A protein has these predicted regions:
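Sequence/structural signature of beta-propeller domains
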Residues: 5-462
Length: 462
């Protein structure tokens, strides 16, 4: 066990209420007008719910935690403009929920904080413009029509184009700060957005030099994410976010390999961690190695300035796939190589295989790191030979060996003051895509158990 495996923000006390495994979070009904494709005689109950994108400890109350929604209920859809997403609750705004574990183990929702732009207007979950994080994902409305600037008129690429939202967000990572504000990472930009306690945007950091909203200024220059982060895959952005105990450094992890320079990197087991010091502006970047290319990193919680708990899973339902994996690793960056300092890497290496590119980052044999690793898994060993060391990871919890966890996703980890870890699944608003259409999200192959947001607890061994 690490020396301080605690919620670093919470004073030690004896008031920590126990978690009953699998306790349900409360939800309401957002929509009940669509047919449930699995059982056409029934209605699809879209639940809100959806507080499973991430979790974070309340800064002072050891029994409270924050949980995050994503962009809202949506499904894969192919319409008149091609493949995209159908937004089944089009006016949905992403939000943060504050929850409390009561003495009897039940969970109470205390409040919701709707995310808003700098003018105090609720943001949507619609995609961003192409230049600022969009991937040309087409949004469709509940009738299957393209969502346009003027919904009263038909689509026209010149006079009435597809609607995007400059401030639209697909939230995935959450850091709750001691001052009551929040940093959120998303899957569009990726963007890192700082919200005040009321959910109004204060600051923003992303990879786009032309975005005037990047207003975290250090020594006269805006802080920007490394340029290669703009090559994130659709729906595979900055899935995880935390802040170090000193409240100085944001730490984010990408869900999967990025499209760097293109889709050829998707077969890689490489993901990237970024550390952003909000005080001095220093940005560091480290390489993380997944157990398998099909796995994803999905949550992070800081233990110290160099150690973190990070979730890794395979998106499989344990009740349907006996080989499913749900894991918590401890990451240690103390011996890892900062690959963001490209000039230093180049200057300190006499190896002609190492090159640097301002848009693609570190290159090996003129290939991006994603391409290099996708080409041969043994290339991880070559990186070490070149003096480029990935993050060290040690298994802390094999969740499926420790508890009954029937969910496909593991996206929220809540570090508690006794060293335990609260686990929160993403229920996708209790809905899922299927060959027949949109249906409830079922945990079992017979489609009898509907998924829902539930809280679990595990005890790490390191």
């Amino acid at each position: 066990m690490t020396s301080i495996p605690t919620n670093f923000n919470s004073p030690l006390s004896n008031d920590l209420n126990p978690i009953t495994q699998g306790t349900a979070l409360p939800y309401d009904i957002l929509n009940e007008q669509f047919q449930n494709a699995a059982y056409p005689e029934t209605k699809l109950q879209i639940r809100g719910g959806g507080f499973g994108s991430d979790a974070a400890a309340h800064p002072t109350n050891p029994n409270q935690f924050y949980a995050l929604t994503d962009r809202g209920p949506n499904s894969d859809f192919k319409g008149s403009l091609g493949e995209g997403k159908q937004f089944l609750v089009p006016d949905y705004s992403p939000k943060i929920g504050l929850f409390e574990v009561k003495a009897d183990g039940q969970i109470r929702k205390i409040k919701e904080i709707v995310l808003k732009d700098r003018n105090g207007q609720p943001v949507s979950g619609l995609p961003n413009p192409k230049a600022l994080g969009g991937t040309n994902e087409i949004p469709y409305d509940i009738s299957g029509n393209p969502m346009t600037i003027d919904p009263s008129k038909p689509y026209d690429p010149q006079t009435n184009p597809v609607k995007t939202d400059l401030n639209g967000l697909d939230p995935e990572g959450l850091a709750a700060l001691e001052d009551g504000s929040f940093w959120i990472s998303d899957e569009y930009g990726p963007h890192l957005v700082h919200y005040d306690a009321q959910g109004i945007e204060i600051e923003r950091i992303n990879p786009f030099t032309q975005d005037s909203r990047n207003n975290v200024i250090i020594e006269g220059r805006p802080l920007l994410l490394p340029a290669e982060f703009a090559k994130r895959r659709t729906n595979r952005g900055m899935e995880s976010l935390t802040i170090t105990p000193d409240q100085n450094t944001l730490v984010g992890v990408m869900e999967s390999s990025i499209d760097n320079p293109d889709k050829s990197g998707r077969l890689s087991t490489l993901t990237r961690m970024v550390m952003i010091n909000l005080k001095n502006g220093v940005i560091k970047q480290y390489l993380c190695r997944l157990d398998a290319k099909e796995h994803v990193n999905s949550a992070i919680a800081a233990l110290s300035e160099h150690e973190f708990y990070v979730a890794e899973h395979d998106r499989q339902f344990p009740l349907q796939q006996s080989t499913a994996k749900k894991l918590i690793y401890k990451f240690d960056i103390s011996q890892a190589t900062d690959i963001n300092n490209l000039q230093a890497l180049s200057d300190n290496s006499n190896d002609e295989r190492i090159h640097c590119d301002s848009e693609l980052g570190l290159l090996i044999n003129r290939q991006t790191l994603e391409q290099w690793i996708a080409q041969d898994e043994c290339h991880w060993d070559t990186l070490v030979e070149l003096g480029i060391h990935p993050v060290q990871k040690t298994l802390a919890v094999d969740i499926l060996q420790a508890i009954d966890y029937p969910h496909d996703k593991l996206e929220g980890i809540w570090l508690r003051q006794d060293g335990s870890i609260g686990l929160l699944n993403d229920d996708d608003f209790a809905m899922n895509d299927s060959d027949k259409g949109v249906e409830h999200k079922y945990l079992d192959a017979k489609k009898t158990i509907i998924d829902g947001n539930r809280l679990y607890v595990v005890y790490p061994k390191v």
